[in-house]
A protein has these predicted regions:
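Transmembrane-cytosolic junction motif
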Residues: 1-10
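Non-transmembrane, membrane-adjacent beta-strand/coil modules in membrane-associated proteins
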Residues: 12-73
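Cytosol-/stroma-facing membrane-proximal "stalk/adaptor" domains immediately downstream
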Residues: 70-93
Length: 93
């Protein structure tokens, strides 16, 4: 399973990482909103770390204009906690 963590001002998801300062406001999704974001609403230009069987999802826009990914879409059993950890990392920079 891909590892997702927030540490030292960075967000790690699977094999990739990004400085939290390059990310916008994270949005935690569950239920129908998460299903839509994983399905018909999925942004093909985003970096995806999506695991089947996990309802929660965090979508974070990338604010670095040089980054080809427009957002990060990350599965999480605790999307509120992941979004809060990203916000804390952004505030510490």
């Amino acid at each position: 399973s891909p590892v997702v963590r927030v540490s030292e001002g960075r967000v790690f998801a699977g094999r990739a990482w990004i400085e939290a300062s390059y990310l916008g406001e994270p949005v935690a999704l569950t239920g129908e909103d998460a299903r839509f974001a994983r399905g018909p609403g999925l942004d093909a230009t985003a970096w995806h770390v999506i695991r089947g069987g996990i309802d929660g999802l965090v979508v974070v826009p990338v604010v670095d204009s040089d980054d080809p990914a427009r957002a990060w879409v990350i599965s999480s059993r605790t999307p509120d906690r992941l979004a809060a950890a990203i916000r804390r990392a952004q505030a510490s920079r």
